[in-house]
Amino acid sequence: MQIKLKDVKFTFNLKSSWEFQALHGIDFEVNQGEYVGIIGQTGSGKTTLIEHLNALLMPTTGTVEWIYKDEVFDKATKTKKEVVVTDVIGLKKVRKFKKVKQIRKRIGVVFQFAEYQLFKATVLEDIIFGPVSYGMDPKEAEEKAKKYIKLVGLPEEYLKRSPFDLSGGQKRRVALAGILAMEPDVLVVDEPTAGLDPWGVKEILDILTHLHESGKTIINVTHDLDHVLERAKRVIVLKNGKIIKDGQPYETLNDIAFLEENNLQPPKLLNFVNKLRAKGVNVPKVTSEAELVSWINDYMETKNKKEVSNE
């Protein structure tokens, strides 16, 4: 699926004394298989932006366009065939977007406090709720639940448990499994690691990486720039409802002056690397702690060998 936003503007409480414009002329597109990090200060418009991606919000002005493959019934051959579909909102004012189901089953959104989305008596019922609502056979949905509960790192036995007996991190995994069970083309996650312990953070990020490697589009809204540096292939920076940067993670996040000018804390990894470079250590481009540790080990080994040979 390809998503295109063209000159999207959005105003809350339009024509009232509480009117507030949250997005100003947003232009960007996301292609199938990308891993995009979206960053910016609180109030920069990140959540408002992603709510346009699956038609939870409709632009005040501008357009959102979705291009995707779908199956239609061919009356001539009496068989289903695959076609490319283009849906657009914003070309004319409508109260209700008719294609919302087709869009939302292809673009799954896991919000920051996803655990509050759980409301059924069992984990199984919660996971299959979305797929069944969008037309999946209940038996097939149960098989998807068994598949994705394991993918998010929970045993199948958890399907029988009440979601309200789970920890916050476990609830978030169940909410993620519920979205994945719909098998969307695009997965949008809003602060997916907030409040998790380091091991939980790594597991969630590994799941997102695995999904990306399997061909899904990942859009990760986060305050943790180290996660964007290590995992994302593209980063979008928002400020006051505008995109002020759209580029490669390393080049963008290593621009310390740009980050500080926009009140963003540089990644801890690059802070440390830049301190080493300031002391004359020629550290190469690294994007993860593992890469840095590996390079330091090689560097120290080479340095020690030179010192021994000079004795």
UniProtKB/Swiss-Prot annotation:
Molecular-function annotations in GO: ATP binding; ATP hydrolysis activity; ATPase-coupled transmembrane transporter activity
Membrane topology: Peripheral membrane protein
Keyword Membrane annotated: yes
GO CC annotation terms, alphabetical: ATP-binding cassette (ABC) transporter complex
UniProt-listed InterPro entries: AAA+_ATPase, ABC_transporter-like_ATP-bd, ABC_transporter-like_CS, ABC_transpr_CbiO/EcfA_su, ECF_ABC_transporter_ATP-bd, EcfA2, P-loop_NTPase
Keyword Transport: yes
E.C. no: 7.-.-.-
Predominant cellular place of this UniProt entry's protein: membrane
Domain of life from the UniProt record: Bacteria
Residue intervals of the ABC transporter domain: 3-265
Stored SUPFAM superfamilies: P-loop containing nucleoside triphosphate hydrolases
Disulphide bridges: none
Keywords from the named record: ATP-binding, Cell membrane, Membrane, Nucleotide-binding, Translocase, Transport
UniProt xrefs under NCBIfam families: ECF_ATPase_2, PRK13651.1
Record note on quaternary structure: Forms a stable energy-coupling factor (ECF) transporter complex composed of 2 membrane-embedded substrate-binding proteins (S component), 2 ATP-binding proteins (A component) and 2 transmembrane proteins (T component).
Family (UniProt): Belongs to the ABC transporter superfamily. Energy-coupling factor EcfA family.
Protein's job: ATP-binding (A) component of a common energy-coupling factor (ECF) ABC-transporter complex. Unlike classic ABC transporters this ECF transporter provides the energy necessary to transport a number of different substrates.
Entry protein name: Energy-coupling factor transporter ATP-binding protein EcfA2
Source organism of this protein record: Mycoplasmopsis synoviae (strain 53) (Mycoplasma synoviae)
